[in-house]
Curated annotation (Swiss-Prot):
InterPro entries in the cross-refs: dTDP_dehydrorham_reduct, NAD(P)-bd_dom_sf, RmlD-like-bd
Top-level taxonomic group: Eukaryota
Residues that coordinate or bind NADPH: W23, I24, G69, V70, T71, Y111
Keyword NADP among record annotations: yes
Tissue expression from the record: Expressed in roots, leaves, stems and flowers.
Function in brief: Bifunctional enzyme involved in dTDP-beta-L-rhamnose biosynthesis. Catalyzes the epimerization of the C3' and C5'positions of dTDP-6-deoxy-4-keto-alpha-D-glucose to form dTDP-4-keto-beta-L-rhamnose and its reduction to yield dTDP-beta-L-rhamnose. Can form UDP-beta-L-rhamnose from UDP-6-deoxy-4-keto-alpha-D-glucose, but cannot convert GDP-4-dehydro-6-deoxy-D-mannose to GDP-fucose.
The keyword NADP appears for this protein: yes
Organism: Arabidopsis thaliana (Mouse-ear cress)
Cited Gene3D superfamilies: NAD(P)-binding Rossmann-like Domain
Keywords: Cell wall biogenesis/degradation, Isomerase, NADP, Oxidoreductase
Family matches, as CDD domains: dTDP_HR_like_SDR_e
Protein name according to UniProt: Bifunctional dTDP-4-dehydrorhamnose 3,5-epimerase/dTDP-4-dehydrorhamnose reductase
Pathway annotation from the record: Carbohydrate biosynthesis; dTDP-L-rhamnose biosynthesis
Enzyme Commission number(s) of this protein: 1.1.1.133, 5.1.3.13
Length: 301
């Protein structure tokens, strides 16, 4: 029997998880297994109310996790030409799930996005002034981000929902094509802009603890601080592949090869850090959870 931080055993929890085929959903199942938490993957489609109700009545969960959603393949540009499909899952589906959970008195942990902000005059690049949970989203450059900002605003009315703003997720699995490090290491050229990011190896276990504590409301679900593309690729070179090289290009040059603009921002992680004081800064977390476990070369001090 596994005990959580509050002393109650993990056997008293029973999680219903949506997003079985997704990256975060898959990792959540593995974490539940490791912690001895009973879990079931939902089989219903998010936008199909009856199938969600059937899942909940069958599983009788203590908490529900939503890691389902449309991000687009290979990237968010897909959403620009598949707007109805994007709305169906990211807006209608998420709201349906939140509404049913509220009816059933269940906390919903909703993995959302922080890609709904961009640096502005009040939060300039390099200033260390991050966007807070209560700030109004200011980035609608992509249809994906637009739908995510809409649904976040509506979910504020559901007191049972915990919205986690994930950004540029990274994990220790460098073979996963969704991993931000793997993505940028494969790009022909990359921009170099400091951003808030989410180290899943550290933060996903925290999200399980948030469910156990029945936390609700919006959280910037990122490690404190920012890291740039070049800083990550320098670590990749130093720890993984000393022969690795890359080329940079400007935002203007990037705009010519993508359909929708991308969000760049710093999120203020104070609220999460206050709840979880052990939370590591982005660069510390990258080294501990990603680069040290994957180290192939002796790193020069």
């Amino acid at each position: 029997m596994v005990a959580d931080a509050n002393g109650s055993s993990s056997s008293s929890f029973n999680f219903l998880i949506y997003g079985k085929t997704g990256w975060i959903g898959g990792l959540l199942g593995k974490l539940c297994e490791a912690q001895g938490i009973t879990y079931t993957y939902g089989s219903g489609r998010l936008q199909d109310r009856q199938s969600i109700v059937a899942d909940i009545e069958s599983v009788k969960p203590s908490h529900v996790f939503n890691a389902a959603g449309v991000t687009g393949r290979p990237n968010v540009d897909w959403c620009e030409s598949h707007k109805v499909e994007t709305i169906r899952t990211n807006v209608a589906g998420t709201l349906t799930l939140a509404d049913i959970c509220r009816e059933k008195g269940l906390v919903l942990i909703n993995y959302a996005t922080g890609c709904i902000f961009e640096y502005d005059s009040g939060h300039p690049l390099g200033s260390g002034i991050g966007f807070k949970e209560e700030d109004t989203p200011n980035f609608t450059g992509s249809f994906y981000s637009k739908t995510k900002a809409m649904v976040e605003e509506l979910l504020k009315n559901y007191e049972n929902v915990c919205t986690l703003r994930v950004r540029m997720p990274i994990s220790s699995d460098l073979t996963n094509p969704r991993n931000f490090i793997t993505k940028i290491a494969r790009y022909e050229k990359v921009v170099d802009i400091p951003n808030s990011m989410t180290i899943l190896d550290e933060l996903l276990p925290i999200s399980i603890e948030m469910a156990k504590r029945n936390l609700t409301g919006i959280y910037n679900f990122t490690n404190p601080g920012v890291v740039s593309h070049n800083e990550i690729l320098e670590m990749y070179r130093d720890y993984i592949d000393p022969s690795f090289t890359w080329k940079n290009f400007t935002l203007e040059e990037q705009a010519k090869v993508i359909v929708a603009p991308r969000s760049n921002n710093e999120l203020d992680a104070t609220k999460l850090k206050t709840e979880f004081p052990e939370l590591m800064s982005i660069k510390e977390s990258l080294i501990k959870f990603v680069f040290e476990p994957n180290k192939k070369t002796e790193v020069k001090a």
